[in-house]
């Protein structure tokens, strides 16, 4: 279904760029809704899952909160609060940073890794079921989105 049909737009868009931007926003919300619904089953928010993925990619090496923020998809998230919630669930550890006592090092625990593995199995299935794109089309879309952001 086209974006015009999805949002029941009767007038044409002012430009192709406007149409693309509206479509990206609409699709972002659609993806967020489906991913959030799945993550809720595990008691995680999309932002908490993002923190766990970032830490899991560190292969056991800790990161400071600021390093986590730099890598997050949602830069407006309160990373300290997210880490606190993950700490309460034993998904991460916090240790005072030896080089900077104002900072703290955060690392994923085995429980956090287990949670990631469980979620990823279902997320891969969800993403495969939602994607109507070939691998080539998905790569092209990713390149176009990078270009849209001027990257």
Where do the protein language model's features map onto the residues?
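Short, hydrophobic-biased segments on the C-terminal half of alpha helices
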Residues: 65, 83-84
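N-terminal leader segment of winged-helix/HTH proteins
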Residues: 1-42
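C-terminal regulatory/oligomerization modules of transcriptional regulators
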Residues: 1-12, 136-151
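Pre-recognition alpha-helix immediately N-terminal to the DNA-recognition helix
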Residues: 23, 50-54, 114, 140
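Charged, amphipathic alpha-helical coiled-coil/dimerization segments
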Residues: 84-139
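N-terminal helix-turn-helix DNA-binding core of bacterial DNA-binding proteins
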Residues: 33-75
């Amino acid at each position: 279904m086209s974006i015009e049909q999805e949002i029941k737009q009767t007038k044409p868009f002012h430009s192709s760029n406007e149409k693309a931007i509206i479509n990206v926003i609409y699709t972002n919300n659609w993806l967020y809704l489906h991913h959030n619904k799945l993550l809720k089953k595990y008691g995680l928010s999309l932002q908490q899952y993002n923190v766990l993925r970032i830490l899991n990619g560190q292969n056991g090496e800790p990161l400071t909160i600021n390093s986590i923020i730099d890598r997050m998809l949602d830069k407006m998230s309160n990373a300290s609060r997210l880490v606190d919630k993950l700490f309460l669930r034993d998904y991460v550890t916090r240790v005072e940073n030896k080089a900077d006592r104002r900072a703290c090092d955060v690392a994923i625990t085995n429980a956090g890794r287990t949670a990631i593995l469980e979620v990823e199995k279902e997320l891969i299935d969800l993403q495969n079921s939602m994607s109507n794109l070939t691998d080539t089309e998905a790569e092209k879309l990713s390149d176009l989105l990078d270009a849209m952001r001027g990257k």
